[in-house]
Each structure stands twice: as structure tokens, then as C-alpha cells.
Amino acid sequence: MKIIQSPSPNFNDRKAPVDMLVLHYTGMETGQAALERMLDAEAEVSAHYMIWEDGQVNQLVDEDKRAWHAGVGSWQGDTDLNSCSVGIEIVNGGHNVPLADGSLPPYPDAQIKAVIELSKAIIGRHKIPQARIVGHSDIAPARKEDPGEHFPWKQLAEAGLGLWPTQAEDAPSNLHLIGRGLGVGNTGAPVERLQQMLARIGYGLEPSGIYDEETQACVLAFQRRWLQAQLTGQTDLETLRRIMAVEQGFRNEG
């Protein structure tokens, strides 16, 4: 894979070994604008790599250094995610630059092919677990939406990157106590059980038994990745079964 070197001044030393991969979209008008921003010392943002629509890859920060891409976030108990992760920015306007009809711009095949090839190389070098291949919205659900519900997570999983619940429909439905569904304002044991499952997957959520805005944000982030046609932030039975299946898959991997 040909990689163009575009050194960014925005990095420092890691405080932990690499065991995580974080995927982002750039969310800007053009890839050039995103690249220039990550090369600007005053912007204080960067990523290790950026992948253009045609599959071109630029490296901005060496993998042994701490790029500044994750910001404030949490996954599986870790909070200094810049220290333990490699970050890839994928050129795509996303929610910030939608198409004329309001839809999200697609990720071209050549770009996704490059994402898969580069990601495989990274996880091979660092022995990154499948459960630690995440999107920006996974680690910061209350403030980030990328790489978006239009990102082909299932395609990546089929290529060996990340987990996909193949038996979600068959997951136990014994949480019938969910009733008609859970949403903001609901409280009690069913909510706490839901929060515990989301926390075990990795979301930075403290089980409280209260379905608050933080819980809603985590459910929505989950749906952006594993139930992309259903972006409600509500937990109906389909969402619950998918959450249970993903949690089981993560537990089996561990």
C-alpha cells in the first residue's frame, strides 16, 4: 500500500501501548481542507492517517506517537484514548456536509477498500482486539456522530474488522419486562440491565436505572453502528436483542 507522508506537528508521546483503532470521518467540505487543518499547529488536531475518496492514504503522525483525534471519550474503562489508539480520518462530509437531498454522502468503494487494507495492517502490527475497533461516536456518543450510520460497518466485519452479531434475531427475548420499549424518563431494573450491557460492550455509561440523555446517546451510537436503519435512541425489542447479541459476541471474544 502506497502511503504519502504529510507530517503534522500535532502530536506528543504516548502514555500507553496501542490496543485500539478509532475511525472518523473528516466532516469538512473537502479532503484538502481537512488535511490543511490537521497540518496547522494552531488547530491542535491530527490523526495518524487520512484516506481520500479515491483510496489515497496520507500519514500525518507516526503510529508510535500520540495523535490528537479522539478528544474526550471513554471505551471499556479507558479515557486517554489518544494514548492507546491509532486514528484514521476518512474523507467524507458526513452530517456536516450532506448531499443536496439531505442524505449523507456515500463512502466510495475504493476508499473503503483502502480503509480495510490499512486497518488490517494496523491491527496486525499492534494485535488490536476486535472489540477495540470503534467509531468516534462509540467513544464520545453525546458529542460525535462519525463515521455515521452510512458507514459500512458490516462490510468491515465481513473483512475481519470488528464484530457483527450474526444471530441478533435469535438473541434471548427474556427481557420482556421492557414492555413497549424504553426511552428517556423510564426508570427501574430494566433500564439498569440495559445500561449494564452497554457498559460491558464498552460505552462510558454508569448504570443508574434512569434512562437519561446519556443513556439515549449511547443507544443512538449503538444504533448508528449495529442497527443503522433505526436511529431513535429508544430501546425497543429489536434494539435490545441486537445489544444482547453484540454484548455476547464481545464476551465470547474476551
Describe each PLM feature range:
Residues 1-131:
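Active-site-adjacent loop/helix surface patches within enzyme catalytic domains
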Residues 94, 139-140:
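Short Gly/Pro-enriched loop/turn and capping motifs at secondary-structure junctions
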Residues 59, 71-73, 77, 105-134, ...:
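Cell-envelope/ECM-targeting effectors and their regulatory/trafficking segments
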